[in-house]
Amino acid sequence: MKKLFLVVTLVLLSVAFLSADVYIKQQTKTGAFMGQPAKDIVQEQWFGNNRIATVTQDNSIVINLAEKKFFMINHKTKTYVEASLPLDMTKLMPEQMAGMMKGMMEGMTVSVQPNGQTKKIMTWNTKGYDVKMNMMGMDMKMVFWATTDVPFDWKKLASLSGELYKAQLRVGEKFVEEFKKIEGYPVASDMEMMGIKITMATVEISEKTPPANLYAPPAGYTKKDKFAMEDMKQ
């Protein structure tokens, strides 16, 4: 399982109930490491009508709270996994990964604390939060910059985002509760892990009509009962 899958998706929080959905576009830059070139990933997030979707070029994760459904969609292989909420990711893992996943989740520690710093990022007034994580003996340090100056109910999003955290980061309730200490929506973050620097920046927050069938697997995609090892490498 790629540990950096953790990195790209550490910023989720709430949904507005509007005729148009909330659209958020973010850019994550990862420095070169272990012979791998630097990466620049664009991620789109959509929130609306009790539905949450996060989309990259290769994958989509959809949470439909009204129908209590979860979808993880692999656009490369044109396959998807469907599950009911509340989500237990270990039940969807390949057998050889389930035990390892459970051990990682149980052994993970996280601490979130306000650091007293403020910063103006684009049009947003933000406050800083220091986040420290340890997973399998690997320390990760992050700084999140969160703002309440957003055109949606960030408190509502924070209360709805737990299942999406679990799906993207493969974590449990303790992790979710700790991240609720962040007041506002994180519009930027800086992270360092094993000498690798990762930065995330929000470049757009707006209201848009979502694409057709955004919150469901595309027609013609094949349903799978569990993730394959290939999915864990995404």
Predicted regions and their residues:
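Bacterial N-terminal signal peptides
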Residues: 7-16
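Extended soluble regions of mature proteins
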Residues: 20-234
